[in-house]
Each structure stands twice: as structure tokens, then as C-alpha cells.
Curated annotation (Swiss-Prot):
Keyword field: Cytoplasm, NADP, Oxidoreductase
GO BP term, example: steroid metabolic process
Binding site for substrate: 118
Signal sequence segment: none
Record-linked PANTHER family: ALDO/KETO REDUCTASE
Record gene name: Akr1c15
Gene Ontology molecular function: any one: farnesol dehydrogenase activity
Protein name: Aldo-keto reductase family 1 member C15
Site residues by UniProt (Lowers pKa of active site Tyr): 85
S-S bridge residues: none
Gene3D superfamilies: NADP-dependent oxidoreductase domain (3.20.20.100)
Protein family membership: Belongs to the aldo/keto reductase family.
Binding site for NADP(+): 24-26, 51, 167-168, 191, 217-225, 269-281
Pfam families registered for this protein in UniProt: Aldo_ket_red
Length: 324
């Protein structure tokens, strides 16, 4: 599945997903109003796939932006592809729908296009996003992710989400779901960190073999939020190899990093709250990387993960100890 000439990809449930998405995560110091402004700019420049989550705590602002853009005639609801995610404190099957309904209420929407399990590591239910005990230790929960999946299938049947999928799953966790008895719907996608320093080639191959779309987050490297990312992480967009290829094509290194994913058959998310860069990030359909460029970018892989999710390292379901 080469997304070179295509603006959307058909998921295994028949629904279409735009191959280029706009990410709405913002670190704490960025005012929430920025998410609304940036989402409007993104829709104005052509983005139709909006990636959000309960955890991001800005769905009211993003939802307002969507409704404003529908009200002014820029888009209709059916033109948009909106993703939300079930947070890790809602993975008990009886809580899944509640999390999705909270998102829908904040958004002011009747349904989302895609709802995915954010991370396959359950934490203690409650209002705290990352619950800790009195000693500052994270409080884990024990949930069979297959039960969570069944609850998500019911949300699809209820019309709350058109498609369902997962995020941050390794291939063994995907197999758990694919091989479960009475599986009603396969995951349509697995959204993972993916960029030239962590190109996920084995996981991509596995997902393609199962007709699951790989969706790339942190495709431009990563935000520098110190609670998630180490301050000495390399700056992907300053990589001399990417800069050379970008110069050759008269593009930015960011555009090359996004184009690279599309040509591998990966749906790619681009996050920026800067108007100029939001525009640039959408301009990836009018140039093509050569097979040599692709090989060269492949060779940058060093299995470097910006977001280790270190808070969950001791969790029995921590996904990143597997090779893929």
C-alpha cells in the first residue's frame, strides 16, 4: 500500500482515512486556546484528519474549532475524520464507553470517525490522569486488553465511533486481539511513534500482513515536553541527511520526513501550532522521494524512541520491551 498518489486509505472495515492528519497534543505551557486556533488553520489549509484524545484535555477547544469551520461552510461533518482515544484509566470494559461519551460531549459531536485504545497499560480508574500513591508511585490496574477491545466493539455497534483501533501496541499485543475468540472487528490501525530514527519497519511489515494501517505520531521527531521527552534527545529535523535530501527537492526537512512515511504506506500525523509550518506540513503531495532517497532515510534508523512512557516501565503490559 503506497500512499504516494492517494489522499486517503481504505481501512479493513471499509471506511476511508485521510493519509495526512493534524495532531492536537500540546504540552502544559501552551494555552488551550492555541489548539482551537491551530485546528482552524489546519482545516483552512486542507487537513481533514484531526487526531485528538481524552488525555490531551483540549477536546472542548478542538471541538469548537470543528464546529466553527462547519458553521462557516468550510467543511461538512462527513468531510472530517476525527480520532479520539480511550485513556488508560478507562480500560476496564465497563468504563470504555464512558470515556468516549465524555469526549463526544466535550466535542459537541454525535460520533467520532475513529476511537483507539491510547496505550495498552491500565491504570487505576478515577479522575486523575496519572494516578499516584502517597509515595509518588504510579498506581497500575490489571485489565485484560481483550475485554477492553470487546467494549470498544460495542461502541462501534452503538454508532459512537465509525472505526476502532489501537495505539502503542507491540505485535504480540496486536496478536492477542487478532486471535481472541469471538473477535467481531479487527483493529483498523495501530498508532505508534514513527520517524526516521525509529522507522518501525518490522511492526509496519507485521501490520501490513494483517491489513492494519500503521499511523505515525512524532513523525517530525518530538515535542520537547520534559515530562515525556529527555532534554538531550536528538533534533530529527536538524539531521544533515534529511537536510541534504530536503535541499535537493527544494522542500523542508519536515516535509521530507512526512513524505517518507506516505511513500512507505504509513498514515502520518503532523503537529504544529505555528501557522507557517501547518501550511508547509500539508504541502507533501506535490513532490516525490526517489528510491535512493527512501533507502538513505531508512538507513537513519537507530531505534531511538522519544517517548519511552517511563511512568509505565514496571507495568506487566509495558509495550516497548519487545523488539517490535
Amino acid at each position: 500500500m503506497d500512499l504516494k498518489h492517494s489522499r486517503s486509505v481504505k481501512l479493513n472495515d471499509g471506511n476511508l482515512m485521510p493519509v495526512l492528519g493534524f495532531g492536537t497534543f500540546a504540552s502544559k505551557e501552551i494555552p488551550k486556546s492555541k489548539a482551537a486556533e491551530a485546528t482552524k488553520v489546519a482545516i483552512d489549509v486542507g487537513f481533514r484528519h484531526i487526531d485528538a484524545a481524552y488525555f490531551y484535555q483540549n477536546e472542548e477547544e478542538v471541538g469548537q474549532a470543528l464546529r466553527d469551520k462547519m458553521a462557516d461552510g468550510t467543511v461538512k461533518r462527513e468531510d472530517l475524520f476525527y480520532t479520539t482515544k480511550i485513556w488508560i484509566t478507562f480500560l476496564r470494559p465497563e468504563l470504555v464507553r464512558q470515556c468516549l461519551e465524555r469526549s463526544l460531549k466535550k466535542l459537541g459531536l454525535d460520533y467520532v470517525d475513529l476511537c483507539i485504545i491510547h496505550i495498552p497499560i491500565a491504570m487505576k480508574p478515577g479522575e486523575e490522569l496519572l494516578p499516584k500513591d502517597a509515595n509518588g508511585k504510579f498506581i497500575f490496574d490489571t485489565v485484560d486488553i481483550r475485554d477492553t477491545w470487546e467494549a470498544l466493539e460495542k461502541c462501534k455497534d452503538a454508532g459512537l465511533s465509525k472505526s476502532i483501533g489501537v495505539s502503542n501496541f507491540n505485535h504480540k499485543q496486536l496478536e492477542l486481539i487478532l486471535n481472541k475468540p469471538r473477535l467481531k472487528y479487527k483493529p483498523t490501525c495501530n498508532q505508534v511513534e514513527c520517524h526516521p530514527y525509529l522507522n518501525q519497519s518490522k511492526l509496519l511489515e507485521f501490520c501490513k500482513s494483517k491489513d492494519i494501517v500503521l499511523v505515525a505520531y512524532s513523525a517530525l521527531g518530538s515535542h520537547r515536553d520534559s515530562s515525556w521527552v529527555s532534554s538531550d534527545s536528538p533534533y530529527l529535523l536538524e539531521d544533515p541527511v534529511l537536510m541534504t535530501i530536503a535541499k535537493k527537492h527544494n522542500q523542508t526537512p519536515g516535509q521530507v520526513a512526512l513524505r517518507y512515511q506516505l511513500q512507505r504506506g504509513v498514515v502520518v500525523l503532523a503537529k504544529s501550532f505555528n501557522e507557517k509550518r501547518i501550511k508547509e506540513n500539508f504541502q507533501v503531495f506535490d513532490f516525490e522521494l526517489t528510491p535512493e532517497d527512501m533507502k538513505t532515510i531508512d538507513s537513519l534508523n537507530r531505534n531511538f524512541r522519544y517517548s519511552q512512557m517511563a511512568f509505565a516501565l514496571d507495568h506487566p503490559d509495558y509495550p516497548f520491551l519487545e523488539e517490535y
